Amino acid sequence: MNKYKNIKRRKSNRIYVGNVPIGDGAPISVQSMTNTQTTNIEETIKQIIKLKKVGVDIVRISVPTLEAAESFKIIKLNVDVPLIADIHFDYRLAIKSIKYGADCLRINPGNIGNKRRILDIVNCAKDKNIPIRIGVNAGSLENDLLKKYKSPIPEALVESAIRHIEYLDSLNFNQFKVSVKTSDVFSAIEANEILAKKTVQPIHIGITESGALRNGIVKSSIGITSLLLSGIGDTLRISLAADPVEEVKVGYDILKTLGIRFRGVNFIACPTCSRQEFNVIDVVNQLEKNLEDLSTPMNVSIIGCIVNGIGEAKVSTLGIVGGSKTSALYKDGIRQKNKLKNQEIIKELEIKIRKKAKSLDKLKKII
């Protein structure tokens, strides 16, 4: 797999969310957020388990009430993924969440309250040695900044962030990351570019409230890719009005495409035409679903005919080239003697992919 060699990541400090390193050259972590009712403990745990299956590094959970904080405590005891408590308005819920085992807090400068409340949160975070995210959002900017700038322009978002960065610095607290988010792609890019020049703390990136699945993927891909290519971003979330599992998949797909971080199978598949000898779309979609749990990076080409099939197969870990009734199989660029029956491609190729993953994992351990 080729790596985009011209990406030079911005230098930043290192913090840890649970056992996940963030900043200072650490792998860019992929986050998501539960969309269940936090008080529905069983469903929230189930969703976190699903997120872990597709490789989530960190999960954020909304804690809007004391009952939700009590639920957070139980959830934390039943999952092994680092959890961020998402806090708005009531600083006491932040303190409760820290005491109940949160690995990190997200606080919103626009609604968390005065410096005294933030001081209490920071003192508690220091005591438990956990980080905080200063999460600035265009939809909840401080009133004085809205009055000054008339609207949540990039400069307003950054001023909010810097205001709180300076306060945390004055408290000798450096275990924090920062985010400046807006639903407008270009405003988000500009705000992060300005912020990156003004702080050495890790930056969390994302396009907030980006929309439903298709539109949200497009917006997030454009915004996040632009920032990553500039070396900005130490952790990310794809915000979608969709199943949170999709957020994680898209996050990894972006990192994979840029050659920054690899997880699981990278499928190369043709868009299909009348030349296809088997149903490429069905095969790819089913294999993607079946292999969600696989973390071993590899390229698998699934091409419906010989036009581009052979060329793609020769540069793939495994490759299928469509033929009449049976299709050619390539392994590490070499055509194999045995062919796969077109009606059994999904089953047989999944077996071969999993077998190859085991051999690659074993080789990696030996090396």
From Swiss-Prot:
This protein is called: 4-hydroxy-3-methylbut-2-en-1-yl diphosphate synthase (flavodoxin)
What does the sequence similarity comment in the record state about its family? Answer: Belongs to the IspG family.
Catalytic reaction(s) noted: (2E)-4-hydroxy-3-methylbut-2-enyl diphosphate + oxidized [flavodoxin] + H2O + 2 H(+) = 2-C-methyl-D-erythritol 2,4-cyclic diphosphate + reduced [flavodoxin]
Name the pathway it acts in: Isoprenoid biosynthesis; isopentenyl diphosphate biosynthesis via DXP pathway; isopentenyl diphosphate from 1-deoxy-D-xylulose 5-phosphate: step 5/6
Classify the source by domain of life: Bacteria
The positions annotated for binding [4Fe-4S] cluster are C270, C273, C305, E312
What's a Pfam family in this record?
GcpE
